[in-house]
């Protein structure tokens, strides 16, 4: 009984057995996808940012004052959407991939945790961890896209300006050519 993502067990005829969280996968070995070479990219706020190397499009929208239907929006949003306190951001928002030693304060947490531990605790497969987009400002991780925002940027009763974030996967065919 090893940890998820450990070295697979070899079976006859070249098959491999690998435990991923609570699933035992038996299959022929696949080549790991190549690492993505991507440093970082500043987001347009408000606006749309296309990141071809990650096949992502990120829409940002700033809203001021009392947000009508906010509770309903929060209740119905999915993992591709988040809403944060815009005034708590420090510097421009940047999208990047994880770096060694990354840490953040996940929403609802009392303290900082290493991003690697966060991924393990949330059962994110090893092969996926280096591909999860990270939104950060000049000081900290703001959103581990698809998983959790940082506690420091959550909405409070004092929030006056919100930033809505929506991430969409785009296939190469959908990426508009350069003019």
Q: What spans do the regions from the language model cover?
A:
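AMP-forming adenylation/ATP pyrophosphatase catalytic core
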Residues: 1-179
């Amino acid at each position: 009984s090893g940890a998820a993502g450990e070295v697979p067990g070899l079976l006859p005829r070249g098959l491999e057995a690998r435990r991923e969280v609570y699933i035992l996968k038996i299959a022929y070995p696949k080549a790991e996808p190549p690492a993505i070479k991507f440093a970082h990219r500043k987001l347009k706020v408000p606006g749309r940012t296309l990141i071809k190397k990650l096949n992502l499009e990120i829409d940002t929208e700033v809203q001021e004052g009392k947000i009508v239907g906010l509770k309903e929006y929060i209740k119905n949003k999915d993992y591709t959407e988040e809403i944060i306190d815009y005034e708590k951001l420090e510097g421009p928002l940047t999208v990047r991939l994880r770096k060694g030693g990354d840490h953040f304060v996940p929403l609802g947490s009392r303290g900082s945790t290493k991003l690697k531990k966060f991924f393990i605790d949330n059962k994110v497969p090893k092969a996926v961890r280096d591909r999860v987009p990270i939104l950060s400002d000049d000081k900290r991780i703001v959103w581990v896209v698809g998983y959790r925002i940082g506690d420091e940027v959550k909405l409070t009763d004092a929030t006056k300006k919100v930033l809505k974030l929506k991430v969409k996967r785009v296939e190469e065919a959908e990426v508009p050519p350069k003019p």
